[in-house]
Amino acid sequence: LEIANYIGIDESTKRYYPNDTLASTVLGFVGDDNQGLAGLESYYDNELTGIAGRVVSAKNAKGTDMRFTYENVVEAQQGNSLVLTLDSYVQYVCEKYLDIAVEQEQIKERGAVVAMNVNTGAILGMAVSGDFNPNSPFTLSAEDQATVDAITDEEEKSAKRSELLNRQWRNKAVSDTYEPGSVFKIFTAAVALEEGLVTQNSTFTCNHTYIVAGNPYHCHDNKGGHGTQTLQQAMSNSCNPAFIQ
């Protein structure tokens, strides 16, 4: 009995993410068959996959592969590489301080940060709170797992688990709609300055609420407002009444 006729080695590949959770909602992940299931892995799956190799071998009268008598190996063709504009340090900083802000402000629906090169529009960092490890994408956070475990009905538990998994995989920064809000205060200030309507030292008073056409608009400062402030201070405070004025 020649044992070599019965033992062979099959090569396989598996995607590994050395940085664990870093940029996980951007990168996404692949399944057991290396097919992209989320993020850029899914979007560019055809470009990244390449062409699978194969082994062609003869069979004997019993239907057993004659791998060492006749065998032809067709090599796999590698897929394309995808190079991102993300900067690993910028990405790390985005994720670190986003997590701090989400905890301090007790955000329930996850936060997001996008850092761009203002000259080219290149994305340098894109972070979403409540991310995951793409090496084990089907593992929920401790908090979400506790939520699932608290459900007794198996059908409801399965549905909740699927909901929470899809939520942690979802890239909120590009998949959810978001009203720009305070982001446009920069443009409001720029237009007012350019047209000579205000200067950096123009003053505005914030008493928390400002009435326009009978409708009250509130400042995010719940301690009675920012009081009298310059345009520069109003920008720093992101004061709603000041920019309405």
What positions do the PLM features span?
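Active-site SXXK
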Residues: 26, 93-97, 121, 177-204, ...
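Short pre-catalytic segments that frame enzyme active sites
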Residues: 66-78, 88, 92-180, 215
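Soluble non-cytosolic domains of exported or imported proteins
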Residues: 34-38, 76, 84-92, 168, ...
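Surface-exposed patches in mature extracellular/periplasmic domains of secreted proteins
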Residues: 8-12, 103-116, 200-203, 245
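Extracytoplasmic/secreted envelope proteins and their assembly/folding machinery
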Residues: 23, 27, 37, 41, ...
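Sec-exported extracytoplasmic/periplasmic mature domains
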Residues: 31, 49, 95, 99-103, ...
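Conserved catalytic neighborhood of penicillin-recognizing serine enzymes
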Residues: 81, 119-120, 165, 169-173, ...
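Small/polar-residue-rich segments within soluble enzyme cores
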Residues: 1-79
